[in-house]
């Protein structure tokens, strides 16, 4: 009986997102340092594509990956706006380090429900992605909702710690 109760409590703890607030620019600086330290260029620049806040790309010819935060769409004075974009794009860097998805398949339905319930606008955006990109974007949107320590620890796990 106790195991069943603990199992339910653990499931609920996963389902309820932590506030997606960076404690300030310290968390942003820490994650940016980690991303840069992993070999990814982190840039702040104007983006010409409408409606995007940032992007992550890998250039095969130069073997360099780049994380861009769009200075013309992200309010750099708002740590939450910067954090959400950085956490999202850093998730794509984590996926590159891992060579694929970073969250166990069994958790995907919970992640989808969480987005649908707590951030329906993210869920609607996610549904517009192609099936080949949906899983990667799901993880990135979901990671925006996590506590900064979780994001930082997860980045360290995938991009600095090798078993």
Q: Where is each model-derived feature located?
A:
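Catalytic Zn2+-binding segment of zinc metalloproteases
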Residues: 90-107
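Hydrophobic beta-strand residues in large extracellular and virion-surface proteins
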Residues: 42, 67-69, 86
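Bacterial N-terminal signal peptides
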Residues: 7-17
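Metalloprotease/metallohydrolase-associated module, dominated by Zn2+-dependent proteases
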Residues: 32, 38-44, 104-163
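Short alpha-helix carrying the canonical HExxH Zn2+-binding catalytic motif
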Residues: 78-94
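Positively charged n-region of N-terminal signal peptides that target proteins for export
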Residues: 1-5
């Amino acid at each position: 009986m106790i195991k069943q109760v603990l199992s339910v409590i653990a499931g609920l703890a996963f389902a309820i997102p932590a506030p997606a607030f960076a404690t300030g620019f310290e968390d942003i600086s820490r994650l940016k340092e980690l991303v840069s330290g992993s070999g990814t260029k982190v840039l702040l620049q104007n983006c010409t594509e409408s409606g995007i806040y940032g992007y992550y790309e890998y250039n095969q010819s130069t073997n360099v990956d780049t994380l861009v935060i769009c200075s013309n769409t992200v309010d750099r004075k708002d740590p939450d706006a910067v954090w959400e974009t950085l956490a999202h794009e850093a998730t794509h860097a984590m996926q590159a380090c891992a060579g694929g998805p970073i969250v166990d398949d069994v958790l995907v339905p919970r992640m989808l429900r969480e987005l649908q319930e707590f951030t329906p606008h993210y869920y609607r955006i996610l549904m517009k992605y192609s099936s080949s990109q949906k899983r990667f974007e799901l993880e990135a949107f979901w990671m925006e909702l996590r506590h900064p320590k979780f994001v930082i620890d997860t980045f360290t796990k995938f991009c600095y710690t090798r078993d």
